[in-house]
Amino acid sequence: MNLKEVSELRRRFRMDRNAISRIYGCFVNSSREIVSYIDESMGILPQNEAEKYLNLLKKALSGKLGKNLIDIIFSTEQVADSDEHRLLMALRDSQLKNGNIREEFYQKIINSLDLGDSNYLILLAYDTYDVHHKNKNDEMDADASDAAFSYVVCCVCPVKERKAELGFFPGDNEFHSCAGQIVAAPELGFLFPAFDDRAANIYNALFYSRKTDEIHQEVIDSVFHTTAPMSAAEQKEAFQNALSEALGDACNMELVQSIHDRLRDQIEQHKESHDPEPLELSVSDAAAILRDNGVEEEKILAFRDSCATQFGDGATLNPANLIDSSRFEVKTADATISVGPEHSYLVETRIIDGRKYLLIPADEDIEVNGFGVRVKGE
C-alpha cells in the first residue's frame, strides 16, 4: 500500500463515512485470561463512545510506511491452503459475525502477545467501502463506484490503571476519590486484506506497530506465519554495521556527514514531490555515494557484500529508516553535540597535540545554561 491508499482508508473512520455496524473485541488481563467480551452496535452507542472506538481503530493505520506500517506478504502456498490465511479470510467473509471464528482469532493473539504485566483490549471491526472511481485529475467521482472493498481492521490497546484523584459526583453533589482503567493508544494492529491499487489484495496485510524498534514478531508469527521485514531500528543498525565493518578507518566524520546529507536530500526531495510510494534506496545507490566520496573500490565491494549478508540480495532500503533526517548528532563518552541537519558541516574533527577534538565555530552569541558568555581573549 502507498500513502494515498492508507490516507483514503483512514478517512473512512468517521461517523458519517464508515459502514461499520458493530464493534467486537475482548478485554484480557495480565494472566492472559479473557475478562469480558465486547459486542456493541455502533447504531445505539452514544456518539462520543462510538467516536472513541473509531479513533482507536484509525490509529492502526497511522504512522510512517516502512516504519510503523509494515507490509505482510503471504506466499502463494499460504493463500492456496493454510490455516492462518483461512482464518483471516473467514473473519472477513463472515463479517465478524461468527463467534467461534472470533474466539479462535482472539486466542492466537492471547497465546502469542507479550505485553508484560499489562492488561489489554483487542478490538475488531468489519467495513465495506464502495471504492469510487477517480477521474483524470485524480479526483473522486462520488457518483461512480468501481467495486466494494471489504476488510477487517484490528488493534490491540493496553489498558492502564489511572491514579486515584478527586472527582465530582453530581448525584451526591460532593467530591470523592475515584480511579479506574483507561484504554491507551494501540500498541499494534493490522488491516486485512491490503488495499493495493485501490482494490483488495488477499496476498498482503498491513501491520501496525506503535514502536518502530519492537514490531512484535511473536504476533506476526502466530497470526500470519511469516517473517516481517526488518524493523526501522534493525535496518539502521544493520546499515551502520555494514559501513563500519567494510570501511574500517575510512568510515570517518566527513564520510558519515556526506552520507547523512545525501540521504537527507533524497528524503526532502521525496517529500516535496508528494510521491505516494515509499522512497527506496538500492545498495548500488548507497555504493555510488561512497564512490563519490573517494572510497576505494575494494571497500565498496566489501560494503556491498556486507549489505547482501545483512539485508539479502537485491534488497531496497528506506533512507528514512537509516538516518534521523531531523538532526545531526555527534556523541562522545561524556558529551553530545546536536545541530540542525542543514548545519552538519559546522562540526569538524581535528587532532591537536595528539588529542582528538570536535570543533564548532562560535562566531555568534554563546549561551551557557541560559547565560550569555564571552570567549576569553575576545
Predicted regions and their residues:
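Long, hydrophobic alpha/beta structural blocks
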Residues: 11-17, 21-324
